[in-house]
């Protein structure tokens, strides 16, 4: 199963792909963003995909189907949508690749 998010507006040209080979396999997440300030930026999935407002007021909270606490990618009981940080280079771009079993592309908890 594969899903793609395309970022428009402030993140013009950004994308993120999600690939999961089977319901029990981890999700491979990779992508590219641009026009961000250099340094670390939190990377997470929100409940809704509406990013028309730059302050994320239309996005809802972090994806959290099990009502866990906020945390990092490595915290066992954090929001499913908490995917850690990405590091943006001085030119405002970042590429990222990770694997996680905290999210799924299958079933009722699918992103």
What is the predicted role of each segment?
Residues 1-111:
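N-terminal leader/targeting pre-sequences
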